[in-house]
Curated annotation (Swiss-Prot):
This is Serine/threonine-protein kinase-like protein At3g51990. The lineage of its organism: Eukaryota, Viridiplantae, Streptophyta, Embryophyta, Tracheophyta. Keywords: ATP-binding, Glycoprotein, Kinase, Nucleotide-binding, Phosphoprotein, Receptor, Secreted, Serine/threonine-protein kinase, Signal, Transferase. The keyword Secreted applies. It catalyses: L-seryl-[protein] + ATP = O-phospho-L-seryl-[protein] + ADP + H(+); L-threonyl-[protein] + ATP = O-phospho-L-threonyl-[protein] + ADP + H(+). The modification Phosphotyrosine is found at residue 233. InterPro entries: Kinase-like_dom_sf, Prot_kinase_dom, Protein_kinase_ATP_BS, Ser/Thr_kinase_AS. Residues 59-329 form the Protein kinase domain. Pfam families: Pkinase. It is found in: Secreted. Its EC number is 2.7.11.1. The modification Phosphothreonine is found at residues 220, 225.
Length: 362
């Protein structure tokens, strides 16, 4: 059906032969946290289109979970298991992104991703993807719904920092592959919450598996979502893993503040234009979600905001890598539990000129 890859040698055909070969894996050389291993070429199940169509009630709108960048997602039950079925839109460009998601997710699996479980590829029918069912919707819904807030999903800073850490680990896993994967569309709507309110990164339609010097990168137009898109990523040759770091920084500000990336009800409407000046003026407590107030521990309050500020630096070379971000957030989770600060040091020789309460924002 098609290929989409940065290197011809690593391309995966969306065909029956692809699924048949999934059990023969080669281990990745990339390092990953032991609690979030990546499985290379996971085993996939091939479904009949008619079975998936029936399981969704004929793609009944009552089973519609949401619409993504390249199709719709429906709830279904196969046997006793809840699954989600992704159905592509009819646009050729959308179909290409849909196939790209298959190419990426058919090769990796992790507890930090919304994993691919199977597919249907009947010649006379549209292709369908079967992914894990996430019972608590998207992080966007969690953050921006008072109903969910009241249920306790993000009612404490320990829970919010845990969610941020889980997302950071997901992005780090992508970047640490032997051939890095750049997601290009990290946002709260693409982070889904499972039944235990663990965060998983999904929607890999815009992702690219390649080294930044590959010709494929240089010929792929910039893409992403307004509000999360790296301002440095204006031409194809400016794509790098730091593009994802910027988007993660926006998402972290969203988790911290409870505000949307862009919200026209406020001035300034862009979350960076509002939050970063407050951090520079030493008013970091003012960026925290007023529904639960800032963290009690002043060190946690300051350092969490500083991590976000580092990620959204205009100069991409001064942004941290996701491995650093994972380390900082891991320290913060420990500090929130112990209410003391001794695990995190975010010193960096690339220092910004602004200060927080008289100290540099590094």
């Amino acid at each position: 059906m098609g290929y989409l890859s940065c290197k011809a040698g690593s391309a995966v055909a969306i065909a029956v032969s692809s699924a048949a070969s999934t059990s023969g894996s080669t281990s990745s050389k990339a390092s990953a946290p032991p609690e979030s291993p990546i499985e290379d070429r996971p085993r996939l199940r091939r479904f009949l289109h008619r079975d998936l169509e029936s399981a969704t009630g004929g793609f009944d709108i009552n089973n519609l979970l949401g619409r993504g960048s390249h199709g719709s997602v429906y709830k279904a039950v196969i046997g006793s298991r809840h699954i989600a079925v992704k159905r592509p839109s009819k646009s050729r460009e959308i179909s290409r992104e849909f196939h790209n998601e298959f190419e990426i997710l058919s090769r990796i699996r992790s507890p930090r991703f919304v994993n691919l479980l199977g597919f249907s590829a009947d010649n006379s029918k549209e292709p369908l993807l079967v992914v894990e069912f996430m019972g608590n919707g998207s992080l966007y819904d969690v953050i921006h719904s008072d109903t969910v807030l009241n249920s306790g999903a993000i009612s404490s800073w320990s829970k919010r920092i845990k969610i941020a850490l889980q997302i950071a680990k997901a992005v780090h896993l992508l970047h640490s592959q032997e051939t890095p994967i750049i997601h290009r569309d990290i946002k709260s709507a693409n982070v889904l919450m499972d039944k235990n309110l663990n965060a998983k990164l999904g929607d890999f339609g815009l992702a690219i598996r390649c080294n930044v010097d590959d010709q494929k990168v240089k010929s792929t137009p910039p893409a992403g979502t307004m509000g999360y898109l790296d301002p440095d990523y204006v031409t194809a040759d400016r794509l790098s893993t730091k593009t994802d770091v910027f988007s993660f920084g926006i998402l972290l500000l969203e988790i911290i503040s409870g505000r949307k990336a862009i919200d026209v009800r406020y001035s300034p409407s862009f979350i960076v234009d509002w939050a970063i000046p407050m951090i520079k003026r030493g008013k970091i407590g003012g960026i925290y979600d007023p529904r639960i107030g800032p963290p009690i521990d002043v060190s946690v309050r300051n350092h969490l905001g500083l991590v976000a500020a580092k990620c959204v630096r205009t100069c991409r070379e001064k942004r941290p890598g996701m491995e650093e971000v994972v380390g900082w957030l891991t320290g913060l989770t420990k500090s929130v539990r112990s209410r003391r600060w001794d695990e995190l040091s975010i010193g960096n020789p690339c220092m910004m000129v602004e200060t927080v309460g008289g100290r540099p924002v590094e």
